Design a protein with these regions (language model features):
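Conserved N-terminal phosphate-binding loop of PLP-dependent enzymes in the Aspartate aminotransferase
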Residues: 1-426
Length: 426
């Protein structure tokens, strides 16, 4: 690759981006007075154009920025808006709860909660559910319950995994073994103390680490999604389940991103049998909400621990978790938006996208790969497609990423800013 030419092309696109977005640039500069990093949340600084565009409005798969530019949104809030922006059934449910009935958060249950629990149980095959405000918290609380019932201190994750900002998951593999992930901010402890880590698709490594007998749970996405999409090899997930059972370790399937595989995520689509299932982001149509499901066996083991404080300050739960507004939005999303029929349509769109990208790559003789997981698809700068997180991370190219992102941005297309994922909504 001609890096000098790539740098020149990137500079040209960035100049064009800056010229096209004077109001967003002014808003970004104004934010520096009182916002850390100029933005409401520091991740928003991941912008190939050197500053983010500012949102004016969004509906469905269309975003309009402060300067009036319209975009086809294939980022969809990095999955949080997988139901599309402001779907009408969710808008109506939120209006009823907040404006008509009132009581957005009264720390009291509503009848919607039982409906949502039953629907999640139907989709994921895990019978008992509890709610959070984020998928990160759903993962945290699932880990706490796993430690409670197993009496074991550690968890196991996969190299270059993503499970929100759960402290224990900021661990990777290098030539010397497990190490804290580069850039890990203010880590409370060395994650090697709390966590074991292996490569995805490596059953021998998993068996070896679980044999230590100190792992409460394996926390995993059934397919990696945040280091590019890495699919499981044939028989791999069945092997993971067999090994966790053999070693007395619980299996936690984080379906927050892999919900794109279908109405019940990979758990339903692939017939998986996890012990706990955290999920979040998309399940409330863009309103903050998360949930975690537990098997009947885990629930019985939790109930048997009379010393565990699940009512007050035992470390599981939160004041806003399960609030009436979020639960109403979850019900509307699951009942009317992210339906079986909607997923069929979304997956069809993703297949069309995947076939189109692959066709362009083949026609141009570009040695990249494109991988689909239900309603999401992603290209990587290598072929064949990576089979684990380490391989996928090694294929990353920040300069090329920036160029493609700002190029597409200037032509009205948004991809997720952290990699090259395209997600479809109903």
């Amino acid at each position: 690759m001609n890096r000098e030419r790539l740098a020149a092309l990137l500079g040209r696109e960035r100049d064009s981006f800056a010229a096209r977005h004077p109001r967003s640039r002014a808003a970004y500069r104004a934010g520096g007075a009182n916002l850390l990093g100029n933005v409401p949340m520091t991740w928003m600084n991941k912008a190939a154009g050197r500053f983010p565009v500012y949102l004016a409005e969004a509906r469905g798969a269309t975003v309009v920025d402060l300067d009036g530019h319209r975009y086809v949104d294939l980022c969809l809030g990095d999955t949080a808006a997988m139901a599309g922006h402001s779907p009408q059934p969710v808008v109506a449910a939120v209006r009823r709860r907040y404006a008509e009935a009132g009581g957005a958060t009264a720390m009291l249950p509503t009848e919607d909660a039982a409906w949502v629990g039953a629907e999640l149980a139907r989709r994921f095959g895990v019978p008992l559910w509890s709610f959070s405000l984020t998928a990160t918290d759903a993962n945290r609380w699932a880990i706490r319950l796993a430690r409670l019932v197993t009496g074991r201190p550690r968890i196991l994750v996969f190299n270059w995994c993503y499970h929100g900002t759960v402290d224990e998951t900021f661990i990777t593999l290098d030539a010397d073994g497990a190490t804290s992930r580069q850039g890990n901010v203010g880590a409370p402890v060395d994650p090697a103390v709390t966590t074991r880590v292996v490569e995805f698709n490596d059953l021998e490594a998993l068996d070896r680490e679980l044999a230590h007998g100190d792992v409460a749970c394996v926390l995993m996405e059934p397919a990696l999604t945040n280091i590019g999409i890495v699919l499981p090899a044939p028989g791999y997930l069945e092997g993971v389940r067999a090994l966790t059972r053999r070693h007395g370790t619980l299996l936690v399937n984080d379906e927050t991103h892999t919900l794109s595989a279908g109405p019940g995520g990979c758990t339903l689509a692939w017939g998986l049998e996890p012990d706990l299932v955290p999920v979040g982001k998309a399940i409330a149509g863009g309103i903050a909400a998360g949930a975690y499901g537990v098997s009947a066996e885990v629930a019985e083991r939790v109930a048997a621990r009379r010393d565990a404080d699940l009512i007050d300050t035992g470390g599981v739960g939160g004041t806003l978790a399960g609030n009436a507004l979020s639960v109403a939005a979850m019900r509307a999303t699951l009942e009317h938006v992210l339906t079986d029929e909607a997923f069929e349509h979304m997956i069809g769109l993703a297949t069309r996208y995947t076939d189109g990208v692959r066709g362009v790559l083949d026609a141009c003789g570009v040695p990249w790969s494109v991988v689909q997981l239900g309603a999401r698809a992603e290209y990587r700068f290598t072929s064949p497609a990576p089979c684990n997180g380490g391989q996928s991370a090694a294929a990353a190219d920040d300069q090329l990423d920036d160029y493609l992102h700002v190029y597409l941005h200037n032509r009205g297309i948004l991809l997720t800013p952290f990699h090259n994922m395209a997600l479809m909504c109903p």
